[in-house]
Amino acid sequence: MGLTTAQIKAIQDHWFLNIKGCLQAAADSIFFKYLTAYPGDLAFFHKFSSVPLYGLRSNPAYKAQTLTVINYLDKVVDALGGNAGALMKAKVPSHDAMGITPKHFGQLLKLVGGVFQEEFSADPTTVAAWGDAAGVLVAAMK
């Protein structure tokens, strides 16, 4: 089961109006929420794994990593309704080698809607669409 046209529109409209112009801020917030929820996963990121959580947002390696992730997510959002699943699946081999599994992607993606609601004016429809998108995108990775 994929996303509906209305869900894709909700995600893309919010993205283009509220996220596209502040990718770094959105990325930093999503990752911070993720690492707060799953602090043990900080070990996956050797370039900043020794940085305390409160110091991450000002760490250049953290900022570079979060920007890399959100730039790719930007491509995935553009491709919703098309090859978004294939784009996600393409990340499996390189991340699997680091011990990062589709489960980790799912944990991160499930937080996106909430972060967008808290910090980037996402409405409940968009938040719910992101919840469904997390499941659809992770399923495509398997």
Swiss-Prot record:
GO terms for molecular function: heme binding; metal ion binding; oxygen binding; oxygen carrier activity. Transmembrane segments: none annotated. Keywords: Heme, Iron, Metal-binding, Oxygen transport, Transport. InterPro entries: Globin, Globin-like_sf, Globin/Proto, Mb-like_M. Pfam families: Globin. Heme b binds at residue 95. Residues 2-142 form the Globin domain. Belongs to the globin family. Hemoglobin F-I appears to function in storage, rather than transport of oxygen. This is Hemoglobin F-I. The lineage of its organism: Eukaryota, Metazoa, Spiralia, Lophotrochozoa, Annelida.
